[in-house]
Amino acid sequence: MVARVERPQPNIFLIDNMVFVPGGTFRMGSDRHYPEEAPAHRVAVDGFWIDRTPVTNAQFDAFVTATGYVTSAERVPLAADYPGTPPEMLQPASLVFAQPKDSASLHDWRRWWELRFGASWKRPHGKDDPRGAQGDHPVVHVAYEDAQAYAAWAGKDLPTEAEWEFAARGGLDGADYAWGDEPMPQGRFMANTWRGRFPDFNSAADGC
């Protein structure tokens, strides 16, 4: 999750933790991969400010402490919203990445993600896992409405899909990846990249 503003207030802390992305045009989407990304088309984006990094657990904790906000993953699901669901399944939960023990299709998300009770931004791996949220790690298990609430509290807004893709591309118009067209340039795994305006690519599952 990253936040953006068009005209930030004269706040040094705010400016220091954001970067300005000059406006421009780029080819958004792709005709070569997922159907929902098509058709590729030219888009014009005005200049905007955006967070240098994804929102951290420490930043999100400050928001929760100040407002008492409860994320969607922490709420008890309503039976009316999920008719036919066994009562024992109506518990706060979220999907957690779980690497398959054997080979699995990249297109079958059920082989890579599992529902864990108690998983939330406070307990990213589930309630039974002793590892808690690290303060400087990107906040996870936040839904779109949670991200909107945080951004409003911070006096910002969420980037549009076009703004996010424009910033993440870092000037590489039409490239498949934020660093170019090769999935593993020179045999190296590119889990995170610093090429763009900020190192946001693949650091956490972005929902905006």
What positions do the PLM features span?
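GGW-centered surface loops in extracellular recognition modules
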Residues: 12-20
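N-terminal pre-domain segments of enzymes
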Residues: 1-12
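C-terminal, low-complexity/hydrophilic appendages and adjacent surface loops
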Residues: 35-38
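Short active-site loop at a secondary-structure junction
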Residues: 42-55, 133-142
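Functional-site microenvironments in short loops/helix caps that host divalent-cation chemistry
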Residues: 20-21, 27, 32, 77-208
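Short capping motifs at secondary-structure boundaries
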Residues: 48, 63-72, 154
